[in-house]
Amino acid sequence: MSHYRQRFLQLALDSNALCFGEFTLKSGRISPYFFNAGHFNSGAKTAALAQCYADAIDAANMNFDLVFGPAYKGIPLATALACEYAQRERDLLLTFNRKEVKNHGEGGTLIGAPLNGRKILIIDDVITAGTAIREVLRIIRNAGGTPTGVAVALNRQEIASETNRQSSVQALMAETGIPVVAIATLNDLLAFVEENASLAKFYEPLLAYKTHYGTEAPD
């Protein structure tokens, strides 16, 4: 497993962003783990997370000159990532959107650098159904930008349903042709748990969940 994946999963565990047990998801599935990026709730945690994002993005050779953070969780993630790249002597443009249209002041729904003519990397925590990302793609294209990739923290690698064996990430990539990179995946989480003696009791439930709901092909 790549070092940044290991760092991310340990950071998520230490921050309680990654928890093990029994969790009912929005889909109704009972998951043996739960990921909540809202628990990266300090400057140090967010900075460490941004380092993991940047390492994953660089490993994937993503081509972009602007980072876009969808409201709301994507906003601090994109901001922290832009700051991390500044530390790496790469000054990227930054934009995010608001969910409510502002009719006074600067107005509109976009805040930050203009998107027109830019190659844009979208930053978010996870992709669930992909609906929010598709809306962001529409916003970017309408503003004259070109979406060139999506980066998320965790790819759950789950099928959409028993009749649709694609994951939301696979469906999004097939539909749009836009690459999606994740810091870590369910496969990485399995390896992480297997290698960590204190987490050994969670390995079999995770494996059973992956066997039932995991995608047949890697994302």
Swiss-Prot record:
Binding-site residues for 5-phospho-alpha-D-ribose 1-diphosphate, renumbered to this chain: 26, 72-73, 98-99, 102, 104, 124-132
Co-factor(s): Mg(2+)
An example Gene Ontology molecular-function term: orotate phosphoribosyltransferase activity
A Gene Ontology term for the protein's cellular component: cytoplasm
Pathway: Pyrimidine metabolism; UMP biosynthesis via de novo pathway; UMP from orotate: step 1/2
Keywords annotated in UniProt: Glycosyltransferase, Magnesium, Pyrimidine biosynthesis, Transferase
Protein's name in the database: Orotate phosphoribosyltransferase
Protein species of origin: Xylella fastidiosa (strain Temecula1 / ATCC 700964)
